[in-house]
Amino acid sequence: MYGNPSIIMGRKKLGDDGMKEQTCCFTGHRTIPTDKMQEIIGKTEAKVRELISEGYRCFIVGGAVGYDTIAAELLFRLRDGEHLDIRVILAYPFDGYTGPWSEEQKATYARLLPLYDERICVAAAASRGAYLARDRYIVDASSACIAYCTRQTGGTAYTIRYAAKKGMPVCNIAEDF
């Protein structure tokens, strides 16, 4: 259905393909309040549709549970519906990073994995630094970021600060709650 997505080890730079100006990354918390889930999905979809109307065609997710999974599922739905021309890319920190996840989370990941147009492994070995390298990688390959961030600490906050330092516009949909 989607062909064989390329699996790339190491530091391939997505921006090298001339798509950076049409690429958006996602960052967000692993835990999402269930009472706000539909509103979060709706606000994310509205922003994605806005970016598509502006010419964005490539979307990068980090492959974590929570907001990354919400974004991926939304993007696949849009791509399989009216926006056949968008690409959905997974940039993950290292092989085996899903080890500590629950069986349900692993099953969701396994269901989504073949749907990505491209899969990029950022680091060769497991480390805390690999997660931060993945976060920098997705920002460096993008020109916009959609986030769900309610805290000033952690990986999501780090990614937003890194994007801001690079001058990238960040839409934090959590600011509306």
PLM-predicted stretches and their roles:
Residues 14, 18-177:
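Acidic/glycine-enriched connector segments
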